[in-house]
């Protein structure tokens, strides 16, 4: 940096120690001769203290949180894949098979839908994700993706368009190993409980099977997600209500019977361990109304 009045020589390092130029008295930043050399080294992006920027944070994480079990009360893992202990063929199936957060960023990056949910090959989809990821520095997805690459695949580099082939081959080689099935990945993460995301009409058959499986000691419980029962504006709403009527045994033809059907399904969920709900409400449409008005509207 140089002084605005060209009083100081150009230097290639800035530290927090401010000094004034002897000629123009402007506050400048110059090389600090008293700082230790190791303090001037650039911090690694993904070291053991990633995101831990204070001594207190490091102590709390490494001495306490790091080895504590995970209770995951909201996720999008398919309970069928846990039950059947799925073995993925490639990293695209793991990362892009149903992750709408990644899909959203790819769309924002101008990626054609063919490479997101379309008929492109898994390798092509991964390439487009890698090219998107390099533009997401500062986004949690950038952190999550690189943390996963390091922890589960041993990759400590950067995923981008140029390294996509290398990462693709490395991850797929690891996924071919027997210890990288869905259940084993969950166990490696020290997870003790998982709550999946389930619709009121879901049968929960895989939760029932997992509850009886003595070979897997991680609890897998359902979570109540009734969004489809509330989305009256959706064109598929009436078809959904027919399915709700079938599984509940209550013909939904009024607001009262809708509530009765949902309550019956809530009881069904509760009997299978459900104790949490999950709602994707962008906003709450509220207006005071009597029971008669609600029935007339519905």
Predicted stretch roles:
Residues 43-298:
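Metal-cofactor-binding active-site regions of metalloenzymes
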